[in-house]
From Swiss-Prot:
The keyword Amino-acid biosynthesis does not apply. Its EC number is 3.6.5.2. Belongs to the small GTPase superfamily. Rab family. Regulated by guanine nucleotide exchange factors (GEFs) which promote the exchange of bound GDP for free GTP. Regulated by GTPase activating proteins (GAPs) which increase the GTP hydrolysis activity at the ER membrane. Inhibited by GDP dissociation inhibitors (GDIs) which prevent Rab-GDP dissociation. Keywords: Cell membrane, Developmental protein, Endoplasmic reticulum, Golgi apparatus, GTP-binding, Hydrolase, Lipid droplet, Lipoprotein, Magnesium, Membrane, Metal-binding, Methylation, Nucleotide-binding, Palmitate, Prenylation, Protein transport, Transport. A motif (Switch 1) lies at residues 31-45. A lipid is attached at residue 199 (S-palmitoyl cysteine). GO terms for molecular function: GDP binding; GTP binding; GTPase activity. One of its GO terms (biological process) is brain development. One of its GO terms (cellular component) is cis-Golgi network membrane. Residues 204-206 form a propeptide. This is Ras-related protein Rab-18. Pfam families: Ras.
């Protein structure tokens, strides 16, 4: 059934409670937005197949609770992940400041040294911004992460965040091949895509 799928990738979404992790996931997988969405209890899980540079990848996306009382679940959902999306709310500086804690947790429990990280500043549709875009970009560069600002509400930047993350994973030797039965798929080298298209001006490939 999935003969044309290059690989299955495990993607995590982490960050403080209320930053919009579930909203980003629902916008990406179902193209829906619910302003009254309840906080995630434990771990939610969705699957979506996307095509990047002509290669199909099935994403198993784990949406995690930000609350401290659910941290006992941590080791199991970090295990085997190839990509992680760290989310903060651009209107809440505290969620940006606490990114260091999430990075420390990632380093503690992640089983791969070459996991690809994407930093997402969410809720750019709101007026009361507390974290400047350049601050996010600087933090991402410091920690060798991809970076994008997004809005789950307006859909701005959401698709790009996931696509750029997957593209980087596929371009990283040894990160996913063991999961794909060595199908010998030839990867295309698409340099021009970073200058325009749907993702133009958003992502910084680091």
């Amino acid at each position: 059934m999935d003969e044309d799928v290059l690989t299955t990738l495990k993607i995590l979404i982490i960050g403080e409670s209320g930053v919009g992790k579930s909203s980003l996931l629902l916008r990406f997988t179902d193209d829906t937005f619910d302003p009254e969405l309840a906080a995630t209890i434990g771990v939610d899980f969705k699957v979506k197949t996307i095509s990047v540079d002509g290669n199909k990848a099935k994403l198993a996306i784990w949406d995690t609770a930000g609350q401290e009382r659910f941290r006992t679940l941590t080791p199991s959902y970090y295990r085997g992940a190839q990509g992680v999306i760290l989310v903060y709310d651009v209107t809440r500086r505290d969620t940006f400041v606490k990114l260091d804690n999430w990075l420390n947790e990632l380093e503690t429990y992640c089983t791969r040294n070459d996991i690809v990280k994407m930093l997402v500043g969410n809720k750019i549709d709101k007026e009361n911004r507390e974290v400047d875009r350049n601050e996010g970009l600087k933090f991402a560069r410091k920690h060798s992460m991809l970076f994008i600002e997004a809005s789950a509400k307006t859909c701005d930047g959401v698709q790009c965040a996931f696509e750029e993350l997957v593209e980087k994973i596929i371009q990283t030797p040894g990160l996913w091949e063991s999961e794909s039965q060595n199908k010998g798929v030839k990867l295309s080298n698409k340099e021009e895509g970073h200058g325009g298209g749907a993702c133009g001006g958003y992502c910084s490939m680091l």
